[in-house]
């Protein structure tokens, strides 16, 4: 996950792109920090991007991506229940065995978000060498460095996000 981008020209400062420096770390130093709406949703028609990578499906593979949020076990079950033969999966390491026979990239252990940050781009790009029609992705909680990982997955998915129950 590349750099954190923050706008210091406004009050309070505004997080434009989460990265290696977490929102929590920024708040320890700066106090109040707002999160730009483009971090958590698609930009609307006519909205101007305030930082690189805000507007478009940055780093998106050719196949459409669906991000499944929620507890890791629930997200894995949701993917199992909804995926079609030949769909690809980006999952936490401990759930890889549930998707035998499907093209798969492991994101890292569900508890190791820094490792997920190191793997997320390679996991997304790997699928461009396959013929999958759909990619399903587990997603870490959007806290700490997980906010950056979730942001990159959600952007790659064009914010096509479902919540596992």
Identify the meaning behind each predicted range.
Residues 1-165:
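Active-site-adjacent structural elements in enzyme catalytic cores
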């Amino acid at each position: 996950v590349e750099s954190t981008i923050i706008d210091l020209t406004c009050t309070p400062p505004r997080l434009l792109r989460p990265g290696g420096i977490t929102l929590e770390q920024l708040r320890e130093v700066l106090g109040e920090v707002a999160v730009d709406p483009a971090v958590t949703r698609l930009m609307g028609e006519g909205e101007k991007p305030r930082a690189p990578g805000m507007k478009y499906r940055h780093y998106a593979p050719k196949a459409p991506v669906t991000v499944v949020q929620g507890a890791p076990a629930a997200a894995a079950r949701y993917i199992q229940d909804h995926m079609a033969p030949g769909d690809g999966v980006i999952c936490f390491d401990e759930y890889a065995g549930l998707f035998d026979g499907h093209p798969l990239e492991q994101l890292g252990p569900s508890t190791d978000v820094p490792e997920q940050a190191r793997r997320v781009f390679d996991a997304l790009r790997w699928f461009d060498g396959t013929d999958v029609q759909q990619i399903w992705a587990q997603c870490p909680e959007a806290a700490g460095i997980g906010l950056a990982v979730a942001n990159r997955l959600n952007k790659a998915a064009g914010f096509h996000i479902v919540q596992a129950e």
